[in-house]
């Protein structure tokens, strides 16, 4: 029998979610079969995923036509399509949610990326989405921007599950963890239950290496000294994993804090680190590098379908999230070496700005293509 390495990962305390959703895989039964066959325990989605699913796909036409007949706006039609897919996916994963007592089985949907810098709009849209979709295993994705984190606290205090997305720096993760804790504290202070609320902190990986490797390649073009070249080469493809391992160490400190212990005593669930952007962009690297190196207890890894297949086939499964911590710290310190001189904080800030933009573009594109489709399908 062929070994599915994804199932071995689960035994080490990491849940595998899939970073993909479309009506095709819902209606064909493929999504349901992935729970049993591949061990998929949840779903993440984003505007780019929905653009790919909906644009040019006739499977949505009947619902678009129904929306036109009901005189819905393009945004209302968009929401009706996406909310239906999310609701159906929630129903498919409800047995996982029940079986794991609310640890897994979540489906994530993002608030519109156009409001990433607007705290109040993020709060109201998160509550509206959660209410409209009406499933307890729904997670609302909120960007971990300075404006997004107060929204996280408020939305958690309302009893809504949150996936905090677009985290690049360790500092942004720490702030996210405390935003979750503050939300639980506020809810507990109102005398309300906190034992059913779940949250993940989505920490991005491959984009970090792509950016830093690009900077290193530029420097390598100008360097002749072999020692300096070796220093630069030694950092390539190492920063994202090092950064993630340091974040995991911070997670361990936070769950040892008195504030967390007080919440844990009331039944609160730990906010798990979720490794995101885990498809390897550089063909010189292993296609499962961001899985193999970050397996560990109380974590999630969300994988696009090609990485799921690759990992099922040849992941080298072991608990590595806490291995080589000293080497990890060294990698991050080396960035400050005058010969390397990469400002990691600047890189992280740039990636956050780009990350929001990478969601706004497909969202806008999807709304535009829906507008075109509405025009085509509207009876003259």
From Swiss-Prot:
Pathway in which the depicted protein is active: Carbohydrate degradation; pentose phosphate pathway; D-glyceraldehyde 3-phosphate and beta-D-fructose 6-phosphate from D-ribose 5-phosphate and D-xylulose 5-phosphate (non-oxidative stage): step 2/3
Main location: cytoplasm
Pfam families for the chain: TAL_FSA
Gene Ontology cellular component annotations, sorted alphabetically: cytoplasm
MF terms in GO: transaldolase activity
Highest taxon of source: Bacteria
Name of this protein: Transaldolase
Source organism of this protein record: Trichodesmium erythraeum (strain IMS101)
